[in-house]
Amino acid sequence: DEWVSRLHDENPGLSIYITADHGMNQKTRLINFQAVAERAGFALYCLPPLKDRYIENHVYQEGGTLYVFLKDAARDAEFVDFARSQPEVEQVLTAAQAAEAYHLPEAAIGDYVLLAAPGCAFAELPGERLHTEASRTHGSLYEREIPLLAIHPAAGPEAYRFSKDIAAILLEERTDP
C-alpha cells in the first residue's frame, strides 16, 4: 500500500494496475490420489503440474489439477469410473479433452487430467487423505478469477476480461494517433 500510494502521489495521472497471475483459495480436503488409486489396484503415475521445489507455499505440492499416466490402457473405463467416484474429484478429462479445453500440450499431460472439487486439492501426502485448515493453493477451476486493481485505468471494467488485456489496451492507447 505504501509504495503504490507513493507512486501515485509522485505521478498523480499515472495509470497503475495491480493484478496476480492466478487466484487463490483455501483447500481443506487434500487427497493423495496416487496412493488411493494404487490401493484400488491401478498402476499409474500422477504428476501435479504445480510441483516445484518452492515448498514454503505448497508443503504437500498441492494443487487443483492432476495429470494421470495409466500404465494399463485396458483399464481406462474402470479407471474413469473409479476417479469419478472420489469426492475430491470434480472432473475427469481425457488428455484430448483437456488439451482442447485448456490449450495444453496433449502429449505431455498424461492419459487423463483430473480437476479437483471445491475446497479440495491433489497433494503428495504421507497418507491418503488429510483435512487441514492450513492449505491455500490454486490450479483448479475455482481460481480462475484474478483480482485487478486499477488507478486511472485506460478503459472501463468491461474491457479487462483477461490479464493480457491490460498490456493490449495500454499499447493500443500509445499507438493511437
Model-predicted regions and their roles:
Residues 1-177:
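Feature captures the catalytic ectodomains and active-site-proximal regions of enzymes
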